């Protein structure tokens, strides 16, 4: 009985969306813009054209600055405060590999 009660009251991680880096062999994030709620988690996955990184402007705690070299490699980012979060792949920002996540 105690075990089932613990399962019921365990906090869950709120999943929101996936972002693909280098999707389809292009220097893009897909999607490059999305809207989520506070507490939601975004999974960022390296696509077909590595290496890439994921750097959130003014938020090093949300960033993954190390380059991901393996296709399919992924990590989760949880957004705990409302705001607009601009992100980019540092090596490919000049090619337009940028985006924004709106958290409300």
Regions found by a protein language model. Give the residues of each.
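Extracytoplasmic copper-binding redox domains, predominantly the cupredoxin/blue-copper superfamily
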Residues: 4, 8-104
